[in-house]
């Protein structure tokens, strides 16, 4: 489909995704915004008093953004979108080397940016306030074996074999803790993973999946669930026959925190680059190999899928899945979690789907990449530093 007329695009997108070009106006009363620091002891067991249905009451009000009544919660079932907005920019990274370490956070395997290493910026898209985004981590999600749903987001009801999230921080905030407290302070590129079909395998994901085998263990004594008494599961079903299994959530449930309450403590913390979550596997990857070959992405506003669930994320979800090793689901499911004796495969690490709430979802096609894996960077490509939405009259 050809690029939409400027008038139609401005009317549709300006009034929906980005609204205005002044950040102060983004702070709408309905947005749930929370800083991302500390890490609560959580479970993905929907019956548990520390499960997804109760996340919003874990150390309330700090985790209040996990309230499922929020208007921009994630993940979602992405609806079928017919119209494609074509933009002239290529979506790619400023460097072919992202240096970091893989660790088991007790929630998911995460490849985190090395502290002090050069930041790798996403090029071809910017924020509505003219700022770039840099990579902070790449982490993975999977469901319970034999369950139909294996991804956090779904595509018109369809799931794949897993999902990778490439998390970016807006450069004017510097760290994830602060960025999570601002609309579009974060940008997440989501790639569906398939063991049977999809875009051809690349070393980027293959290398990360191979490393996951070396970080299966989690040091529970250093984690947020250490020395925390978890309330017994207590369900409405015990009181009302045939009622769905729902836990009774405990308000102000005690959770582990950073030692100095600032986000720079010494306990395991998913949101810190040096979160001390057990063994680390240091390496480097070419981040361009993580992006979709066919650069079509669903674009919408949403939130983090783990506490604090802040509605601060601009999501780009690739339309086509990436083919990966058949061992991917197994190595992720076999990882130990925050809770002693539990592995990810017991309950998966997928937050329940959240309501779309009439959010607009756009299908955006970036310009095809040609030789980016062979060193063709965007350093001298003038249009690559601008947001593609500037073509649509947004910036």
Curated annotation (Swiss-Prot):
Reversible hydration of carbon dioxide. GO terms for molecular function: carbonate dehydratase activity; zinc ion binding. Belongs to the alpha-carbonic anhydrase family. It catalyses: hydrogencarbonate + H(+) = CO2 + H2O. Transmembrane segments: none annotated. PROSITE patterns: ALPHA_CA_2. Zn(2+) binds at residues 139, 141, 165. SUPFAM superfamilies: Carbonic anhydrase. Keywords: Lyase, Metal-binding, Secreted, Signal, Zinc. This is Putative carbonic anhydrase 1. One of its GO terms (cellular component) is extracellular region. Pfam families: Carb_anhydrase (PF00194). Component of the acid-insoluble and acid-soluble organic matrix of calcified layers of the shell (at protein level). Residues 42-365 form the Alpha-carbonic anhydrase domain. Gene3D superfamilies: Alpha carbonic anhydrase. It comes from Lottia gigantea (Giant owl limpet). Residues 1-24 form the signal peptide. Its cofactor is Zn(2+).
């Amino acid at each position: 489909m050809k690029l939409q007329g400027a008038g139609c695009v401005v009317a549709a997108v300006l009034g929906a995704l980005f609204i205005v070009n002044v950040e102060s106006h983004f702070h709408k009363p309905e947005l749930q915004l929370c800083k991302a620091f500390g890490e609560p002891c959580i479970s993905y067991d929907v019956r548990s008093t520390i499960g997804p249905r109760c996340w919003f009451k874990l150390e309330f009000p700090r985790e209040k953004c996990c309230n499922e009544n929020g208007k921009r919660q994630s993940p979602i079932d992405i609806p079928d979108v017919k119209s494609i907005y074509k933009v002239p920019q290529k979506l790619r990274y400023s460097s072919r080397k992202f240096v970091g370490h893989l660790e088991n956070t007790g929630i998911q395997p995460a490849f985190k940016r090395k502290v002090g290493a050069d930041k790798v910026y996403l090029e071809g898209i910017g924020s509505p306030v003219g700022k770039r985004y840099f990579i902070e981590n790449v982490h993975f999600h999977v469901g319970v074996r034999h369950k139909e749903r294996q991804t956090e987001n779904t595509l018109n009801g369809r799931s794949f074999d897993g999902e990778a999230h490439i998390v970016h921080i807006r450069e004017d905030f510097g760290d994830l803790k602060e960025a999570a407290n601002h609309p579009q302070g974060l940008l997440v590129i989501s790639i569906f993973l398939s063991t049977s079909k999809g875009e051809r395998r690349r070393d980027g994901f293959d290398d990360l999946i191979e490393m996951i085998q070396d970080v299966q263990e989690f040091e529970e004594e250093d984690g947020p669930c250490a020395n925390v008494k978890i309330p017994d599961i207590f369900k409405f079903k015990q009181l009302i026959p045939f009622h769905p299994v729902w836990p009774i959530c405990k308000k102000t449930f005690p959770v582990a925190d950073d030692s100095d309450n600032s986000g720079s403590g010494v306990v395991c913390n998913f949101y810190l680059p040096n979160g001390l979550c057990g063994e680390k596997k240091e390496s480097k990857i070419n981040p361009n190999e993580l992006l979709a070959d066919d650069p079509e992405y669903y674009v919408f506003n949403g939130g983090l899928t783990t506490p604090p669930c802040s509605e601060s994320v601009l999501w780009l979800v690739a339309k086509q899945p990436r083919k990966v090793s058949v061992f991917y689901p197994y190595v992720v499911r076999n990882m130990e979690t925050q809770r002693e004796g539990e592995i990810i495969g017991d309950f998966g690490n997928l937050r329940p789907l959240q309501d779309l709430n009439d959010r607009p979802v756009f299908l955006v096609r970036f310009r095809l990449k040609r030789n980016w894996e062979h060193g063709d960077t965007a350093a001298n490509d003038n249009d690559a530093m601008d947001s593609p939405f500037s073509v649509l009259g947004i910036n």
